[in-house]
């Protein structure tokens, strides 16, 4: 379920959440629950306690989305470098940077969102999707000059990593000292980098 929330909240457009999704509410498969006035449609807010881990994950994902305007831009993504800054607003990758694998059997995808295409200048964001049943190593695209990649979210563990302040992330870094040129992504999980 963390994967679903990560995909939803890292997508462009308005996230469509139904009341209770944030704590795993279910209507037991009933997609016509509008005509029920019983426990199928009632929300049991006690689940916010019993499902605290997913509830907290959703809260933190919403906060992450709010912090990064590149995740909720007003313009549609073009996959072109329309600003002439060296990277497109969005690019698609496979386990190798800049080499997307759209074959039928591929279960891995990387998406790079150019931070300078946000409403205000933002961090670049790279999202590594591994829907395969084994661990996979993802080669990360070169970060913007003077920056390096930091893992921010890992759906396998549900962990949100503490990031250094933006000032420290922008300092000059020698290319050979860049952190995370490759990253091992656990099976059926997503890792978000900034």
Which ranges hold each PLM region?
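Carbohydrate-interacting/catalytic domains
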Residues: 2, 6-17, 21-194
């Amino acid at each position: 379920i963390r994967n679903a929330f990560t995909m939803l909240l890292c997508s462009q457009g308005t996230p469509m959440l139904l009341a209770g999704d944030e704590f795993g509410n279910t209507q037991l498969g009933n997609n016509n629950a509008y005509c029920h006035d019983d426990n199928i449609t009632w929300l049991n807010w006690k689940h916010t306690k019993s499902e605290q881990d997913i509830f907290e994950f959703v809260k933190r994902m919403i906060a992450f989305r709010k912090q990064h305007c590149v995740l909720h831009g007003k313009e549609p993504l073009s996959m072109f470098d329309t600003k002439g800054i060296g990277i497109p607003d969005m690019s698609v990758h496979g386990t190798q940077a800049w080499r997307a694998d759209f074959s039928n059997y591929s279960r891995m995808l990387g998406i790079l969102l150019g931070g300078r295409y946000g409403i205000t200048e933002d961090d670049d964001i790279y999202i590594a999707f591994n829907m395969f049943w084994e661990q996979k190593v993802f080669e990360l695209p070169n970060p913007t000059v003077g920056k390096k990649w930091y893992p921010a979210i890992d759906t396998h563990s549900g962990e949100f990593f503490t990031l250094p302040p933006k000032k420290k992330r922008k300092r000059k870094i020698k290319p050979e000292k860049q952190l995370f040129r490759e990253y091992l992504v656990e099976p059926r999980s997503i890792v978000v980098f900034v």
